[in-house]
Amino acid sequence: MAEIVAAAGVPHTPAFPGLVAREGPDSETAQLYGQIRAHLEEADVLVMFDSDHLNTFFFDNLPALSVPLAASAPGTNDGTPGMNNRTVPLAAGLGTEVLAGLTERGYYPSRTAKLSMDHSVMVPLHFLDPGERMTLLPIYLNGLAPPLPGAARCLALGADVGAIVEAWDSPLKVALVASGSFSLEVGGPRIADNAIAGVPDVEWVKHVSQRLKQGQAAELVAEATSDRMRAAGNVGGELLNWIALLGAVGPRPVEVLEQQAHLGHSYAAWTWS
């Protein structure tokens, strides 16, 4: 059976690849991603909880939950600076298992047979798999367009995804990843003049990071209402990706937690051994 070997949460700021290209491997961003990457070295497959930024899906067909079944997908589809476009191999067999397993458990995921991926997937992949050796299964949660999925449902979803992965008839090793920030406003009214993004709720970032540090998933779920997440920014629902990850992690303590509250996010890692 497949084995989960690690879990991690990272931001996907689209400026980061270009920033690291300019500043080099000693930059703070490169070092933080490097810490997380070290925890994922055993993995053959990355399962990534992600919220698309209306580049893979749009309002005419925007699922609350979607599992790709494609064998590969190109990215980036949004012109992220500092990155080369490439075609990423997807774990279609695992996708089929996850789709079936979640449906049997009472979820209603859409299936995606053809897709392209934006920076929310490709930036983490750029830093966590620079050798391009892993296959990927993105699991899309709607974290942007209300109504958002409930936090408790996302926690349960993560636990079920973990169980499905561990029951997958495969010798491969799997790492689970959450992609996103805790507080972020993009192109909205709560940013500085002449800025394209900002962090409207630094204290929420600190609070969420403390919940992660203390392993308080249930408390975080109770606090992460749709209104509370939206108060943290128009993409504050990306927190749901982290909550899904916590469902899979269970009671395991976090091993790495590096907070960048002024940027709206943290980096975190858990290992299973």
Over which residues does each language-model region extend?
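Non-transmembrane, aqueous-exposed alpha-helical and coiled segments at domain scale
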Residues: 144, 159-174
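Flexible, D/E/H-enriched segments
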Residues: 1-43, 59-156, 167, 189-273
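Beta-strand elements within well-structured catalytic alpha/beta cores of enzymes
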Residues: 44-50, 139, 172-180
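Catalytic metal-binding/acid-base residues of hydrolase active sites
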Residues: 52-54, 182-183
